[in-house]
């Protein structure tokens, strides 16, 4: 199962890094990177990350009464990938935003209360802040998403 998390981590980091380079700046949000690539890339990455995370995260939270948070978060990540065109389609916008809020909230709660690696999130938020001091206010959504996903991937490893 650890193989799945390694694959998800490598795919996410590669996608993230190349997206920042391609954009020549920090994106406003992770979802905004959808518009930088052919239409299949962002959905493929989010689906791969969501489905790869699911069995490993469920195993990592086994026995916890909050295990359902990992399921909700993974499913929400997959739905974000299935509804990427949030700027041009009102229905996709609604689904995308609801799933983004659910994924963020449930991942954050799981990271803090179940996995116990809340300090990893703080470290990555600080690193993101230091890498973008002047533009952090404009890109705060991206930095929060990025820090949360990387913290989560590392804490499950």
Segments the model singles out, each with a brief description of its role:
Residues 1, 55-67, 109-120, 157:
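Helix-coil boundary and interhelical linker segments in multi-pass alpha-helical membrane proteins
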Residues 1-60:
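N-terminal topogenic module of multi-pass integral membrane proteins
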Residues 6-9, 46, 50, 67-74, ...:
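Residues within membrane-spanning alpha-helices of integral membrane proteins
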Residues 40, 97-112, 144-157:
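Small-residue-rich segments of transmembrane alpha-helices in multi-pass membrane proteins
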Residues 49-54, 102-110, 124-129:
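Hydrophobic, membrane-inserted alpha-helices
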Residues 57-61, 82-89, 113-114, 130-136:
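Juxtamembrane "helix-exit" motif on the non-cytosolic side of transmembrane helices
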Residues 67-122:
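Membrane-proximal helix-loop-helix units in multi-pass membrane proteins
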Residues 115-157:
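Terminal transmembrane helical module of multi-pass membrane proteins
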